[in-house]
């Protein structure tokens, strides 16, 4: 099977957008029935329901972003630089190399009206570490030896070992002391400090109301997160004035037709998140680094970025995006189908058959089918399987796959790679779903966690990137821009570099 050249793919992409033009034209021929701004919440479209609204257990992208509207940590990450800034904390100071003193704000209360103080911080950190709670984020606090309340407004945190990312880790949502170790609350009923409180969740929507006394000034508008699986339905909802915000949910092929309609605009910024292909290394030939490297050689990243992704992505040369402080300069990952075919033959893997998992998003399915065709050209038969996100995550955690296309969520700190690649993070302890077991990689991940000097850490991650170019435990694909489509009333909205939605609270 021969792969269509790039011009043909561009033509097919344009044709796909044309399918929706008559519907949009019909809509634009009618008066837009946009409700008055104060009459309805700001509607944010999402492609899937959050798996849970409990910040102790959430791991999916929609759930992570939703819970960060409801809950707040001691710090938050700067929307542009991703550096830690005071949030529920007033400030902090290092007493020595392993002891951090955090002072708390006195103008913040929980949604219920309960006061916020040091005992809540201490209880939260202990709960996230507790095996009885079973938080998926327990690793974030595993370097904390103790947390003690010096007084109602001061917490002293002591580390058990050098740990470079403590301040970033304190972005962890703070819960009320009497709820921190409570049973799971997937409905979002845990008391929070964020700018919104959950009113209702279920039936494809999460309704959030502005909160008084939170870490931010009270937002002007309520927010509803609306699950709409089909891209055409999303576009029509935006055009009709029913929805206000869609982040990374309108494909490049459809975007120009949608933006031609009145009352809609788009913003774009470089993203910090990596789209990659995960490899199940315990499955036969996929455990061979030569095979994984050959699979990488088969993939024409630049062609997909320029066509299917509409130029709104940059081919990946490694795990960290170019704007990231830990990015290591290096040549782009090559595309060489002939060499890939030879290396597969040398490894005895020519003709192997694999299952390639992806989400039900139309664009993701299109991308997966192009990647499968490129793999077919080098002698690998990839059967594309599209799944709802919950089903897909369950299969990944169980190891029931060969290849899968994923996005590393919120690549704010390279230490997050420990959760996805360290041998101690194989599910259910973490998200090392490829079952990577590499002592050299573990050592570099551990070193990056404990080295405090930023220049020394950058050197550690440069060595890690060099190792990954040899081993290809994951196959980096590209870094996608954060692209938002907004209504006139939400035109000031822009997501942060890692894709969070806190700017919703600033919509006038």
Stretches found by the model and what they are:
Residues 45-96, 126, 191-192:
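N-terminal lobe/hinge region of extracytoplasmic solute-binding protein
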Residues 162-218, 222, 230-232, 337-338, ...:
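Gly/Pro-rich hinge or "lid" segments in bacterial periplasmic/extracellular proteins
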Residues 383-392, 397, 419-488:
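Extracytoplasmic/peripheral linker and loop segments enriched in polar/acidic and small residues
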Residues 211-256, 381:
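Ligand-site clamp/hinge motif
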Residues 93, 103, 137-180:
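Surface-exposed binding/hinge segments that line
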Residues 484-508:
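Long beta-strand-rich cores associated with HINT superfamily self-processing modules
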Residues 91-134, 156, 237, 285-287:
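Aromatic- and charge-enriched surface segment that lines or borders ligand/interaction sites
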Residues 287-373, 463:
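Append "and occasionally in soluble cytosolic enzymes with long acidic Gly/Pro-rich linkers
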């Amino acid at each position: 099977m021969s792969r269509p050249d790039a011009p043909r793919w561009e033509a097919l992409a344009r044709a796909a957008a044309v399918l929706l033009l008559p519907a949009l034209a019909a809509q634009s021929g009618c008066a837009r029935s946009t409700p008055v701004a104060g009459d309805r919440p700001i509607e944010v479209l999402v492609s899937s329901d959050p798996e849970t609204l409990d910040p102790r257990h959430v791991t999916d992208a929609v759930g992570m972003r939703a819970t960060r509207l409801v809950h707040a940590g001691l710090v938050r990450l700067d929307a542009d630089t991703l550096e830690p800034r005071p949030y529920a904390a007033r400030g902090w100071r290092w007493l020595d190399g392993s002891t951090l003193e955090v002072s708390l704000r006195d103008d913040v209360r929980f949604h219920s009206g309960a006061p916020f103080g040091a005992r809540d911080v201490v209880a939260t950190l202990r709960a996230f570490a507790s095996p009885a709670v079973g938080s998926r984020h327990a690793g974030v606090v595993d370097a904390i030896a103790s947390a003690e309340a010096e007084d109602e407004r001061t917490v002293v945190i002591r580390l058990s070992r050098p740990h470079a990312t403590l301040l970033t880790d304190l972005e962890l949502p703070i819960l009320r002391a009497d709820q921190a170790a409570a049973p799971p609350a997937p409905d979002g009923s845990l008391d929070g400090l964020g700018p919104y409180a959950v009113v209702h969740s279920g039936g494809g929507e999460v309704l959030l109301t502005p909160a008084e006394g939170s870490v931010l000034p009270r937002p002007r508008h309520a927010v509803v997160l609306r699950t709409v699986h089909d891209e055409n339905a999303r576009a029509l909802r935006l055009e009709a004035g029913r929805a206000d915000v869609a982040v990374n949910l309108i494909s490049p092929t459809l975007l120009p037709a949608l933006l031609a309609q009145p009352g809609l605009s788009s913003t774009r910024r470089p993203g910090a998140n990596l789209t990659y292909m995960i490899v199940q290394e315990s499955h036969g030939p996929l455990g061979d680094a030569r095979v994984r490297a050959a699979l990488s050689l088969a993939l024409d990243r630049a062609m997909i970025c320029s066509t299917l992704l509409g130029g709104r992505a940059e081919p990946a040369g490694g795990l960290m995006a170019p704007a990231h402080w830990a990015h290591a300069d290096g040549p782009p990952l090559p595309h060489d189908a002939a060499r890939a075919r030879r290396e597969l033959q040398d490894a005895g893997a020519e003709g192997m058959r694999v299952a390639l998992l992806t989400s039900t998003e139309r664009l993701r399915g299109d991308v997966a089918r192009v990647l499968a065709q490129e793999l077919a050209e080098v002698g690998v038969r990839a059967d594309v399987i599209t799944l709802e996100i919950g089903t897909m995550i369950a299969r990944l955690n169980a190891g029931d796959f060969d290849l899968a296309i994923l996005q590393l969520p919120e690549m704010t700190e390279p230490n997050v790679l420990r959760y996805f690649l360290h041998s101690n993070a194989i599910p259910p302890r973490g998200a090392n779903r490829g079952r990577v077991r590499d002592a050299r990689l573990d050592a570099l991940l551990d070193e990056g966690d404990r080295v405090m000097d930023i220049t020394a850490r950058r050197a550690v991650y440069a060595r890690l990137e060099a190792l990954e170019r040899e081993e290809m435990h994951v196959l980096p694909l590209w870094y996608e821009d954060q692209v938002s489509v907004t209504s006139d009333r939400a035109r000031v909205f822009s997501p942060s570099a890692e894709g969070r939605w806190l700017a919703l609270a600033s919509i006038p």
